[in-house]
Amino acid sequence: MNGGAERAMRSLPSLGGLALLCCAAAAAASTASAGNVTGGGGAEGQVVPSPSPGLRDQASSPFPKTAAPTAQAPRTGPPRTTVRKTGATTPSAGSPEIIPPLRTSAQPAATPFPALDLSPATPSEDGHTPTTESPPSRPAPTTLASTVGQPPTTSVVTTAQASSTPGTPTAESPDRSSNSSGVPPTAPVTEAPTSPPPEHMCNCSEVGSLDVKRCNQTTGQCDCHVGYQGLHCDTCKEGFYLNHTVGLCLPCHCSPHGAVSILCNSSGNCQCKVGVTGSMCDKCQDGHYGFGKTGCLPCQCNNRSDSCDVHTGACLNCQENSKGEHCEECKEGFYPSPDAAKQCHRCPCSAVTSTGNCTIESGELEPTCDQCKDGYTGQNCNKCENGYYNSDSICTQCECHGHVDPIKTPKICKPESGECINCLHNTTGFWCEKCLEGYVRDLQRNCIKQEVIVPTPEGSTILVSNASLTTSVPTPVINSTFAPTTLQTIFAVSSSENSTSALADVSWTQFNIIILTVIIIVVVLLMGFVGAVYMYREYQNRKLNAPFWTIELKEDNISFSSYHDSIPNADVSGLLEDDANEVAPNGQLTLTTPIHNYKA
């Protein structure tokens, strides 16, 4: 019996008190065996008696009470009582001591003893005994009231001892001191063994886990690296993919703006929105621009280009003769059609007559050339302007030498030929290059009237224009001898002036004719000379062309042939010394003498 029990026993005044105490302990043990035995968490069983309300109202016991044990699930089978103790030895520390069960004979109690405070406790893992209240379904233990009228001064606490090894039941033998007192010990009760908690095999991935040997012993969950998931950290998280080259889970890095989700395939390619491309969906496809929160926008090129700048959206490589940021304009030299299609057509403007560009106004069907060159006019710059005429489809300026008034005659010259119209300043001719009859050019190239000095009968002179001289005849004066002389002089001057004017008019034409005649004569003479030389050479060739003969020796004759066709019947009699040889009709000579008699 431990020290606490011994002190309690010594406090009893007599052996009768000891007997009454034994009876009370036996009654308490009998009550505990009736249904107050509980198992503690698979580690040890404990007796949980619940004190009656009467005992709770009594004065406190000199022994320190332990806290109520933690509620445990009831065991199946016959109830057993196990008495255990904790590692503590002093009551002041709150650790219970071993009190072996006492078996006594059933004796009716004359007077009730003070109620025993039976507070079994289950030790916790740290060595202290936690307390718990008994379940309400369990009956309260039997208490014995004292026969004496004095309040009790002591109480007996039944405790349980925690085994040295959790979960291993041990049988305690009764204390020898109890045997010396004559109380038989209670048979030891052993607790049924309980199964230990299951231990999980971690089996963590060497690549995906932080530690292959460390995991949660309850769930088996391993500690994973970033990007790995699963019980064993053997799969990739969302937003990661397994790179088969390195065998690791790598992040997808899908763009939140261009990708449909954060997921990617086994190659690391994200699923892109419409108009977005790239393995991470972070750039625009051809034909799209403006990568942003909504993805990419299609290029606005009026169906004239398939590509544009990925940042600004400016169209590139505009087709169909168009230009502009969105291919909405026509190139230089083209104009948009008046219909809804707005197709670009070439301007009907020649680059020779205009700048080549044109415009079309709203509501018009034909374009107008922007700017015509000098000398051209019209909607398409295909007409000659006033003061110009058409010379081989080119507008050439009229050459009237300033003798046509452009105000009175805007055209100045005829558009089809260039002949000047309404020559002024006493001029005439195709280009107004001649002076009228009776006019001559002065030093400034102006046509002025020609004047001559005419003597009068009084001995004075007067200035008379050439025109008046040719049209008027002076009246004979008193001096008849002077009159013929005067008339002769006047007419002589007039005739000389007229001849000079006529010579000036005809000289250029005659000069041209003379030059042409000389050229023709020279050409004819050269042709005659060449023909004469050719005839002479032919004659010499015919004269010197002698016949050439070839002689072929055969067995009994000599054959010859001429290489000149102009002598078909040449005389070959001189080829042989013997004149008696006859010439065969076929050109063969018959030999009448031995072969050594002729000469080659």
UniProtKB/Swiss-Prot annotation:
Against SUPFAM superfamilies, the record matches this protein to: EGF/Laminin (SSF57196)
> Which domain of life does the UniProt lineage start with?
Eukaryota
The annotated region (Disordered) lies at 33-199
Q: Transmembrane ranges?
A: 513-533
Tell me the membrane topology, using the record's own terms: Single-pass type I membrane protein
| Predominant subcellular localization, coarse grouping | membrane
Write down what this protein is called.
Multiple epidermal growth factor-like domains protein 9
